[in-house]
Amino acid sequence: MSQPRTVTVLGATGSIGHSTLDLIERNLDRYQVIALTANRNVKDLADAAKRTNAKRAVIADPSLYNDLKEALAGSSVEAAAGADALVEAAMMGADWTMAAIIGCAGLKATLAAIRKGKTVALANKESLVSAGGLMIDAVREHGTTLLPVDSEHNAIFQCFPHHNRDYVRRIIITASGGPFRTTSLAEMATVTPERAVQHPNWSMGAKISIDSATMMNKGLELIEAYHLFQIPLEKFEILVHPQSVIHSMVEYLDGSILAQIGSPDMRTPIGHTLAWPKRMETPAESLDFTKLRQMDFEAPDYERFPALTLAMESIKSGGARPAVMNAANEIAVAAFLDKKIGFLDIAKIVEKTLDHYTPATPSSLEDVFAIDNEARIQAAALMESLPA
């Protein structure tokens, strides 16, 4: 019998983290948990660490260290806290690391995991959006296997087995269109956060649900795909597919189109990366084609979803613009969730920040963090200028 594969989950208490742990806990004979991390959710982190007999549990907020230590009392799990502890957890040398810390906060730990030269399952798309060049350079330098977790990128990965770019005519990234695909602009102006997080197909965290509603998520995914697959931007196409059954497609020069199809359950792409290059059984529902009455496709509406246009313009411009856009979007989404701005204001804040702040191309992680911080300051200040 082979040795259990050692695993670390960065962002263990979020939506992706929960799904990852669900699969690991169903297969504890095959996986040994090295470290689990969370931002502030002490209870879920401690419970998961004890259930999986993790070696270490790390809470990002250092003020919660004593709470975590108390929650782990009586177990063999080590407690640690703070930003440096997150990076240390990523560097503990697990065979497989899930990078699922939301936003730019996960950048440093994700890069640390990549530098260990093992396998990294990437669910933190913001890492590639803000620091794509640096990330891909590190993957190449350290011989790391980088596996995409986002359903669309995982689908492309599965449909692109030999990664021979010369054979590809186009890559089609599908989008559900979110909860407001057919909603008028007038109605979108009044939607609440509670309504906006209700995705029609996927179960996701609040931030990514809002990104899906604005279609910024699809823009971020386009940038991520551009870095992951190193395909010219003009070969990518976004296609709205409301049923979320086809997760993405690759068309080859001979006219063949390979599509990855399945029920909308994140445990499928997570399971693919967890077992890769093998396969594992997951509890995802098997697709019943006899009940699939139709599959619809339509072009995205760039006028009603300007965030998608902003993302496309950012990657075309390159440099620091994707990092600025990502930071401004995180600030705007947080403000919307706090009911400080309206839904349509999210894209306005991002656009204003891009207009006001044009830094030089980052050449180091420190540059990325400086750009990210300044973009957040600018976005927060620009929110004050919005009409009441």
Swiss-Prot record:
UniProt keyword Manganese, yes or no: yes
Family per similarity comment: Belongs to the DXR family.
UniProt: Mn(2+) binding residues: 150, 152, 221
Keywords for this protein: Cobalt, Isoprene biosynthesis, Magnesium, Manganese, Metal-binding, NADP, Oxidoreductase
One example GO MF annotation: NADPH binding
Regulation: Competitively inhibited by the antibiotic fosmidomycin.
Annotated GO biological process: isopentenyl diphosphate biosynthetic process, methylerythritol 4-phosphate pathway involved in terpenoid biosynthetic process
Organism: Zymomonas mobilis subsp. mobilis (strain ATCC 31821 / ZM4 / CP4)
Catalytic activity: 2-C-methyl-D-erythritol 4-phosphate + NADP(+) = 1-deoxy-D-xylulose 5-phosphate + NADPH + H(+)
Pathway note: Isoprenoid biosynthesis; isopentenyl diphosphate biosynthesis via DXP pathway; isopentenyl diphosphate from 1-deoxy-D-xylulose 5-phosphate: step 1/6
InterPro entries: DXP_reductoisomerase, DXP_reductoisomerase_C, DXP_reductoisomerase_N, DXPR_C, DXPR_C_sf, NAD(P)-bd_dom_sf
Summary of pH dependence: Optimum pH is 7-8.
Keyword Membrane listed: no
Subunit and partners: Homodimer.
Name of the protein described by the UniProt record: 1-deoxy-D-xylulose 5-phosphate reductoisomerase
Cofactor: Mg(2+); Mn(2+); Co(2+)
Co-factor note (free text): Requires divalent metal cations for activity. Prefers Mg(2+), Mn(2+) or Co(2+). Is inactive with Zn(2+), Ni(2+) and Fe(2+).
The enzyme's E.C. designation: 1.1.1.267
Any Pfam family the entry gives: DXP_reductoisom
Temperature sensitivity of activity: Optimum temperature is 50-60 degrees Celsius.
Purpose: Catalyzes the NADPH-dependent rearrangement and reduction of 1-deoxy-D-xylulose-5-phosphate (DXP) to 2-C-methyl-D-erythritol 4-phosphate (MEP). Cannot use NADH instead of NADPH as the reducing agent.
